[in-house]
Amino acid sequence: MDSNPGADQAVAPIVEQALRTAMSAGWEVRGTTSPNPPVGAVIISTSGEIVGTGATQPVGGVHAEVQALADAAGKTEGATAVVTLEPCRHTGRTGPCTQALIEAGIKDVLFLHSDPNPSAGGGEQVLVDAGINVVQLPSPEGVPDALIPWLKSVQLRRPHVTLKFAQTIDGFTAAADGTSQWITGEMARDYVHADREHRDAIIIGTGTALIDNPSLTARYPDGTQREHQPRRVVIGRRNIADAGDAASNLNRLGFEQYATIDEALAELYATGARDVLVEGGAGLASGFANQGLVDWLQVYQAPLLLGEGISVLAHPLTNTLKGASALCPRAASGAGR
């Protein structure tokens, strides 16, 4: 076993290409695999060619390694498997991926992340005991990693939370009269819908539900619905089911309501959600932030000035600069206005 991320095999061009391909495959299935992780896998033949690619299928379907092995049928003996997550060793709805790799005659297994799940982890040692060379790879630069939210969720025993909001350049999410449509442009809104498709749930507060009457669906620019739809979740004590026309879209499409943030996150995690998007409003955003429950921020900033208006957070987090929450920027890009 060689768990040194700097091993020569880890930096071979074909291995880096295979890892990037595997990460891309995992990225594409985000939102469709929970509670299982969105894993990608690639098979490299003995001649050094990529001959199989796979990704985790929805619950009950095959795991990434099994799909990649099937894609590489007849070319797996002595081959190398490159996987974004340590292969599982447990039997659930499907058999252990370690056994599938062993039976396929795989010689080397290169993986990116260790599996923190006690029931599934430990696959590395199973493979080593079977005589397979195992190497843990370093993360390549500039490649989105679909597993980060899932890994964080397993660690925290709650869904990974991204707080999303749009704001003017002076920090307001709506004007003083309450108008907010639209701070951002069409390109940004299209991106939001594409992102929603890859989330397990979209969360809003009762105020947003009653004021905006949102659908919380993932749609294409022409208005048609995308293939995967996240769960629609409302947090708060006002009864949305009895709100009539004020919340007609949610009542037509169906939604879940929980009284508190803690109750919502506990039930969402228990029922398989691992990656959720909080879309507002200011009171709910404050609640998540004050409880230290925001893992990522997704901010759309428009080149607009208001001077006054409704802030992102309804309640302060601190009254001193020393108490401010320090953030670590991950990426920035343009998305129109």
Curated annotation (Swiss-Prot):
Q: Which UniProt keywords apply?
A: Hydrolase, Metal-binding, Multifunctional enzyme, NADP, Oxidoreductase, Riboflavin biosynthesis, Zinc
Cofactor(s) for this protein?
Zn(2+)
What's the Enzyme Commission number for this chain? Answer: 3.5.4.26, 1.1.1.193
Positions of disulphide bridges = none
Pathway, per record: Cofactor biosynthesis; riboflavin biosynthesis; 5-amino-6-(D-ribitylamino)uracil from GTP: step 2/4; Cofactor biosynthesis; riboflavin biosynthesis; 5-amino-6-(D-ribitylamino)uracil from GTP: step 3/4
One molecular function GO term is:
zinc ion binding
Residues holding substrate: S180, R196, L216, R219, E279
Q: Which positions bind Zn(2+)?
A: H63, C88, C97
Q: Where is this region: Reductase?
A: 158-337
Q: Which InterPro entries match?
A: APOBEC/CMP_deaminase_Zn-bd (IPR016192), CMP_dCMP_dom (IPR002125), Cytidine_deaminase-like (IPR016193), DHFR-like_dom_sf (IPR024072), Eubact_RibD (IPR004794), RibDG_C (IPR002734), Riboflavin_Biosynth_HTPR (IPR050765)
GO terms, biological process: riboflavin biosynthetic process
Where, by residue number, does NADP(+) bind? 166, 173-176, 182, 208, 212, 281-287
The catalysed reaction is: 2,5-diamino-6-hydroxy-4-(5-phosphoribosylamino)-pyrimidine + H2O + H(+) = 5-amino-6-(5-phospho-D-ribosylamino)uracil + NH4(+); 5-amino-6-(5-phospho-D-ribitylamino)uracil + NADP(+) = 5-amino-6-(5-phospho-D-ribosylamino)uracil + NADPH + H(+)
| Active-site residue numbers | E65
| CMP/dCMP-type deaminase domain segment(s) | 13-124
Annotated stretches, region: Deaminase: 1-157
For this chain's record, the cofactor binding note is: Binds 1 zinc ion.
Q: What is this protein's function per UniProt?
A: Converts 2,5-diamino-6-(ribosylamino)-4(3h)-pyrimidinone 5'-phosphate into 5-amino-6-(ribosylamino)-2,4(1h,3h)-pyrimidinedione 5'-phosphate.
Concerning its family, UniProt says: In the N-terminal section; belongs to the cytidine and deoxycytidylate deaminase family.
The name this protein goes by in its record:
Riboflavin biosynthesis protein RibD
This protein's species is: Corynebacterium ammoniagenes (Brevibacterium ammoniagenes)
